[in-house]
């Protein structure tokens, strides 16, 4: 299966630079049907994209801007939002403008069609791939899974520990690993992420009763305060006034109960702070997962994901 990278990851490669180095090189890339990448300079009033090719400019006509733009399944914002960003394309021809300057006619849609036929259409639930975060909403993360084609990672599938917004975990432009959760009849893919962040036991093995460790307050309830120790592990401390969600904390681990997936904590201190988002720790390098069981063996409550 051919792998297609997200937009922005090939623009600085030697082969891409060589293809943009001269008109002759661009003509050769047209003949060989090579996929190239360059920066979109503007989107005109007809929503054609103008692209900087270095030795000349290129135009991506509106109907060549994206797969699905013709039938309306992809909106024009998908083109407008590419301005000042890299776009992938194939050169489908050359023309002269009113000033007798040669320019290239480009197709982004052709690259996306190739990506869909040779890569995305062959994915199945449980496949683990890399993707790039393109933008975030309250409900989830939009990912470039190849050639500018997007998929969705819902917020409740990012981690076991609940979060208020995806920006707690990710940043725009970040490359992450995700697992294919489902594919609908239109070929739209929904992803998950929490299955790659380790089981309860794998995360709990990094801690021990008697330790005082850092955490983040994720939820304050009348019966207690949930503190995240890792993205896939949280514990419960007694309620204390003046502590709110988002606070950083130092917590003492009182006990750990694998058979109930419970960690009892004592909050030593809680405070407001701005710390860098820690790097993601993945617990598996597999490229496919059939089933993932979060719960420890013998636990009465079963938390699992079945992709088979």
Q: What function would you assign to each model-found segment?
A:
Residues 1-308:
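Single-stranded RNA-binding regions, centering on S1/OB-family and related RNA-binding modules
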